[in-house]
Amino acid sequence: MEPDSLRSYYNMTGAKGSINSTQMIFGSSNQWFSPANLASFQAWAYSPVIPAVALIGGHVNDTKCYIHSFCAEANLDMQYIMTMSPYSPTTFWYTDAWFNIFLQEVANTAKPPKVISMSYGAYETGMPAGVHTSFDIEAVKLGIQGTTLFASSGDDGVSAFFARSDGSKCAYDPVFPCTSPYVIAVGGTIVSLWIF
């Protein structure tokens, strides 16, 4: 979906961000971010071509993206957050650490961002309970500092991936960290073509 369509659909036509509304993308799972791809996307979307202000943890490389799946998630996240809020300084932070460790590291920075978007997740039942508790504690610490956390409900929502091929195998298996009470859980947007 084009950024302008999202702006119109959610009535965000005037939202452009500002220098004080910092934002961060959580990168993981061996996904690469391509600054050149971001610039191309911004130009395509008629958005100001503004680079990320900070790249932490590596996994930033234009040449790795010759295979789409190497960069799909990281590029999508950076493209849309920076097009929807182009004047907000944006950081890409890559780590293979658990979500709670990532939040600890961010909370220990001099000035945590105002918004963190995490489109990665893991089935809640497969994670150690200690990770949930530690994540919640770190999320509260960031919240006190003024940071809002957004987390994806995953590609399958709570139905789990078994339902992809067989709807009768639907199960209740939500994705963490969107199940934390200290994040805003974000589901998918499906819009019928006739609306536009």
Where are each of the predicted segments found?
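Substrate-binding/charge-relay-adjacent region of secreted/lumenal peptidase catalytic domains
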Residues: 1-188
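Short acidic, Gly/Pro-enriched loop/turn segments at secondary-structure junctions
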Residues: 193-196
